[in-house]
């Protein structure tokens, strides 16, 4: 998994974004809370990370409460 994260960082993703993306590859759909728990990203940062991944077209959100990715 570390090699995948390093490769994603090479393409411009932050460490947290790469970890969130890998978490979603393993289990999706998932809520921000679930992604935070699985990827080891602080909940205070996970939604900003997911928003960036959405704007890059790498993930898409669905639903309202709770939003799943």
Provide a role label for each language-model segment:
Residues 50-51:
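Short, hydrophobic-biased segments on the C-terminal half of alpha helices
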Residues 62-69:
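Short, Lys/Arg-rich nucleic-acid/phosphate-binding segment
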Residues 34-39:
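A short acidic, leucine-rich amphipathic alpha-helix
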Residues 25-31:
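Short capping segments at the starts of secondary-structure elements
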Residues 1-10:
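Short, Lys/Arg-enriched N-terminal segment that forms or immediately precedes the first helix
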Residues 57-58:
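Glycine-centered, phosphate/nucleic-acid-interacting loop/turn motifs that mediate DNA/RNA or nucleotide
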Residues 17-24:
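Short alpha-helical "packing" element that flanks the helix-turn-helix/winged-helix DNA-binding module
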